[in-house]
């Protein structure tokens, strides 16, 4: 039997150690054992991870050599940080690592970096330009939301054309960065609109989604304040959390029967939404799914639904009546809280659970209110 040499053994041990915990999360244990430098920046005990910077950090800061991971939210809202030097040892930049660094004007991503996390540079509004080096193989959702400076992408794993970032096959739309465009036609062949792809595109009024798209990610169109017209094709099967959240001028939506999953807050705070058709295939309505849709006066809940989530329709102050289908067994906490115009509700015998304040501030006739109290107790009215 041939045994490894000492040098081979040492290298193997180092390689194994390298892969032990290269997560971008700063764990509680790591933070408890952290080494803090003179600027209030916390590093992991072994020096491989930059865990957390003080929000008081200002001016220029140089990350220590040997750091491999810049953790999630490491420089979160360090609003006085103006310049950052990242060493060539860094391979991963975590989720929201530089989110809210509004004074940051100068940063160079070294060509050692292979992964950039969700919203890594979100709200870096003073950053005039950013270069994605050719070493980057992984961009988690849209790293550049509300970061409107110039972008240059050298990585062969992505395509950046006309201020729109795609994966190399152009099957995923990652970041739409043309902030002045009022309408956009997503190219045929795109199958996925990733998390945050169109987030905060405040001038965008209409988007055409092709039949090739099957999924709309979390926050995909969130805070597109001017978006008033969108057609979801019947190829789409899932709509992510807060996918259309805060689309204040979105007036009507038809969700096709192909959709089986609607995420939490998917249409929350769509204040102008007055017309909504839900698909027959969905089994649950998520938490906050249509919360604060103030103009929504009627909705038909399909018979396939078995549960209505917490705050699902809370604040829908124009909603006048609702019929809960026979298949529903549970209605979440504050599900219809603040539906001031709601005067009629039909709750089937199959409902076994109604959360606290589910119908708080609903103006039911007294006889209906007493009937519901006798069935479910006073807690459902807060």
Show where each model-derived region lies.
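Consensus positions within tandem repeat domains that build extended binding/scaffold surfaces
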Residues: 72-73, 94-97, 117-120, 141-143, ...
